[in-house]
């Protein structure tokens, strides 16, 4: 699967937020000025047009979840097809990705690390090995670290880090057994208020 391999800190500066959650692992501020865009003229922030704001928000969310453009557009089409609020549907679809669920359960420090665990066949879903990061997790599905992967230092470190963060209410995790359950779809109030999904809906609705 294609994925972005370029400089990630530069993208975080472009969007003005810690896209890849590096600050949860190491001090990002010491090496990355999030309030300043990259480049020689990064400090000169002009007023964005409505289209510019919509595009920036789409890029931000796409990069947070590690999804390329074509796949992100497909998520939007599916969200628009479903009943209910299209923007909220979009966020729920992104939250159902296996790599995201592995991250939310605290088995990985970042979504990128979670993608690695999935791709390297370290994850069981309902008792079966799944190595597709975009695999859709449904309510009541179980996600377990494979026995031979349970001693990986990065998983142990991630669980320790997760103890310092607010725990998602839509997943249940047994840190000792290294297994979890996706209890329900997250509600909009469960997710980051820094995301304005309506801007994405406006962008794709044109």
Swiss-Prot record:
Annotated ranges, domain S4 RNA-binding: 96-156
Regions that span the bilayer: none
Cellular component terms (Gene Ontology): small ribosomal subunit
Keywords for the protein's UniProt record, in alphabetical order: Ribonucleoprotein, Ribosomal protein, RNA-binding, rRNA-binding
Matching InterPro entries: Ribosomal_uS4, Ribosomal_uS4_bac-type, Ribosomal_uS4_CS, Ribosomal_uS4_N, S4_RNA-bd, S4_RNA-bd_sf
Pfam family, one: Ribosomal_S4
Disulphide-bridged cysteine pairs: none
Ranges in coiled-coil conformation: none
UniProt-recorded Gene Ontology molecular function terms: rRNA binding; structural constituent of ribosome
GO terms classed as biological process: ribosomal small subunit biogenesis; translation
Oligomeric form and interacting partners: Part of the 30S ribosomal subunit. Contacts protein S5. The interaction surface between S4 and S5 is involved in control of translational fidelity.
Similarity remark: Belongs to the universal ribosomal protein uS4 family.
Record's function text: One of the primary rRNA binding proteins, it binds directly to 16S rRNA where it nucleates assembly of the body of the 30S subunit. With S5 and S12 plays an important role in translational accuracy.
PANTHER family in the cross-refs: 30S 40S RIBOSOMAL PROTEIN (PTHR11831), SMALL RIBOSOMAL SUBUNIT PROTEIN US4M (PTHR11831:SF4)
Name of the protein described by the UniProt record: Small ribosomal subunit protein uS4
Natural source organism: Pseudoalteromonas translucida (strain TAC 125)
Gene (UniProt): rpsD
